[in-house]
Design a protein with these regions (language model features):
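Positively charged, low-complexity terminal tracts
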Residues: 1-60
Length: 60
């Protein structure tokens, strides 16, 4: 399996909100360790937040 494979997943906005909350919680409780993993989590948090904002904008 290629570790650099990209995948597409369909999720509801509720799923995205839950995943965003989970990532935020994990970052708040970060025990230290792999800095690269922490960077990925920050990137994921930003991406998920942009999805939530886009959904809110489109609902106007």
């Amino acid at each position: 399996m290629n570790p650099n494979s990209d995948y597409t997943v369909e999720m509801s906005v509720d799923d995205i909100r839950l995943l965003y909350k989970s990532v935020c919680f994990h970052l708040e409780k970060w025990p230290g360790g792999d800095a690269v993993e922490q960077e990925y989590l920050h990137h994921m948090k930003g991406s998920l937040y942009r999805m939530i904002l886009e959904h809110k904008f489109n609902e106007l």
